[in-house]
Regions:
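Internal alpha-helical transmembrane segments
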Residues: 1-33, 243-244
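Alpha-helical transmembrane segments of multi-pass membrane proteins
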Residues: 12, 16, 198-207
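Alpha-helical transmembrane signal-anchor/signal-peptide segments
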Residues: 27-44, 49
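Conserved PDZ fold ligand-binding element
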Residues: 43-65, 131
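Functional transmembrane alpha-helices
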Residues: 99-203, 220-242
Length: 245
């Protein structure tokens, strides 16, 4: 029974991985290379240069440029110990992001996010990194909601998701209006597939949380049964699930 209920979340993660393989196989991945530094910003003052590959931030290994961005978003203004590779040599530096009052955010002063083509085995590897990134992000976001650092409105329901999909479709059609239909169709497919990677990974995590009426809640009762050696009375379990709904 545990394996049957756990199959749902596991399928969510598998779907996210398969779609990530397709997206990364066609579009590459955003390796954390520095494409450029901004004058008079902390990154330049700390010695970072175009072409550097950032490998860790404050001891946490990074494989995607987005991991740096999300770390800074969740730790605004925090000093960063950055490890990077230049000419096959590892270097370390420390910097404090600069606050931009106009945008109400902190910046290192680097830009990147370009997607780099990968070999087939790297595609599998970076697809795992992609799923891991989405899983870790949703877990940390949930933690920030419980601590009050993130509002509940940050999460979208079905209407919000539908609106996001519509916005993505319109963006592709507008930005590629002069491109061929096949190019627009491929870009739209990869864009939507990448979005489904995020949704599937998020659903996998949410369905494993011990929330009544969800898979995680049912798994919790089965684990209690396994420990006790007998099931929780059906009436009591039903009350908990109804309350959860």
């Amino acid at each position: 029974r545990i394996s049957i209920i756990a199959a749902g979340p596991i399928f969510n993660f598998l779907l996210a991985f398969v779609l990530a393989v397709i997206v990364i196989g066609f579009a590459g991945s955003d390796k954390p290379y520095v494409q450029g530094v901004i004058d008079k910003y902390p990154a330049q003052e700390a010695g970072l240069e175009k072409g550097d590959l950032i490998t860790s931030v404050n001891g946490s290994r990074v494989h995607l440029f987005r991991e740096i961005q999300i770390y800074m978003a969740m730790n605004p203004g925090k000093s960063l110990d950055v490890t990077y590779v230049r000419d096959n040599q590892t270097h370390e530096t420390t910097l404090v992001p600069k606050y931009d009052e106009a945008n109400n955010t902190y910046y290192m002063g680097i830009y990147s996010g370009a997607r780099y083509g990968l070999k087939w085995y790297e595609t599998l590897q970076y697809s795992l990194y992609e799923v891991k990134y989405n899983v870790v992000t949703v877990i940390k976001s949930l933690g920030m909601i419980f601590t009050g650092d993130l509002p509940m409105t940050s999460f979208s329901g079905p209407v919000g998701i539908a609106t996001t999909v519509n916005d993505m479709v319109e963006e592709v059609n507008t930005s590629m209006a002069d491109e061929s239909f096949s190019d627009r169709a491929m870009t739209m497919f990869l864009t939507l597939a990448n979005f489904v990677v995020m949704i599937s990974a998020n659903l996998g995590v949410m369905n494993l949380l011990p929330i009544p009426a969800l898979d995680g809640g049912r798994l919790l009762f089965l684990l209690i049964e396994a420990v006790r050696g007998k099931p929780v009375p059906k009436e009591k379990e039903a009350i908990v699930h109804i309350a959860g709904i």
